[in-house]
Amino acid sequence: MADENKFEQAKGNVKETVGNVTDNKELENEGKEDKTSGKAKEFVENAKDKANEVIDKFKK
């Protein structure tokens, strides 16, 4: 999943850059959305991992 989130962020960065260079605001905004979505998913995934680590410590 982490790779997918990084890919989504990179894809968003490319879209945003191309949209900016070509003055295509729709593509630029789509890129911003992809980047934000990828970052949010990555944050949630990291939070889940940390929560599971804490839970595992209490199980021992």
UniProtKB/Swiss-Prot annotation:
InterPro entries on file: CsbD (IPR008462), UPF0337_stress_rsp (IPR050423), YjbJ_sf (IPR036629)
Basic and acidic residues: bias regions: 23-41
SUPFAM superfamilies: Hypothetical protein YjbJ
Pfam family, one: CsbD
Span list, region Disordered: 1-41
PANTHER family: UPF0337 PROTEIN YJBJ
Recorded family membership: Belongs to the UPF0337 (CsbD) family.
Protein name as catalogued: UPF0337 protein SSP1134
Organism: Staphylococcus saprophyticus subsp. saprophyticus (strain ATCC 15305 / DSM 20229 / NCIMB 8711 / NCTC 7292 / S-41)
